[in-house]
Regions:
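Short amphipathic alpha-helix
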Residues: 13-24
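An amphipathic, basic-hydrophobic alpha-helix
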Residues: 62-91, 109
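Active-site-proximal region of nucleotide-activated glycan assembly enzymes
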Residues: 2, 108-159
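Residue-level detector of alpha-helix initiation sites
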Residues: 10-11, 15, 97-99, 121-125
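An aromatic- and histidine-rich active-site surface loop
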Residues: 37-41, 91-110
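Conserved nucleotide-sugar phosphate-binding/catalytic loop shared by glycosyltransferases and other
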Residues: 2-8, 27-72, 152-154
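Structural motif
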Residues: 6, 33, 94-95, 117-118
Length: 159
């Protein structure tokens, strides 16, 4: 079985993935999809295949760059689709953050099961946007799980 991990934008989206990857590496084939950000540097030490997608960061304040985000997201999703078609995983595990968005949307379009995990009490923007594309939204807190029709509290993956 092959698992594609995704998540990034900050170390908080990557370090829990590394803990899970370490635990699962002897039983599953592991790969990672993310941007050229911190996730790429942190995952490099793990030694698994890394698939790079150029995903724009969501900007919440008004800036002219916001007008380019939809087109850049489409391009990032297409890139993720091409990668997943060539090397389809059996499932995708997302830890959230803007870097995970293309992998989750592409996996959903290809009918690849997706799990996402939200560590924070208040769900992040990416989790809110992809929740309906996932089989489950796994959470660290019971009250967070209640915010999603497919929410399930499982605790937090740590090293």
């Amino acid at each position: 079985k092959r698992i594609l991990f995704t998540g990034g934008g900050s170390a908080g989206h990557v370090v829990p993935n590394l803990a899970l990857m370490q635990e699962l590496k002897d039983r599953y084939s592991i790969a990672y999809m993310g941007t050229d950000g911190i996730e790429r540097r942190l995952v490099a030490s793990f030694g698994c295949p890394y698939f790079l997608v150029n995903c724009p960061k969501f900007v919440r304040s008004f800036t002219p760059k916001n007008f380019t985000i939809p087109l850049r997201l489409i391009a990032a999703e297409r890139s993720a689709l091409n990668i997943l078609k060539k090397q389809p995983p059996d499932m995708v595990f997302s830890k959230g953050g803007y870097a995970s968005f293309p992998a989750v949307w592409a996996a959903h379009r290809l009918k690849i099961p997706v799990l996402t995990h939200e560590s924070d009490l208040s769900p992040g923007l990416c989790t809110k946007l992809v929740a309906r594309k996932c089989q489950y939204v796994l959470t660290s807190f019971p009250e967070t799980a209640k915010k999603f029709r497919n929410g399930k509290c499982v605790g937090s993956p740590i090293r």
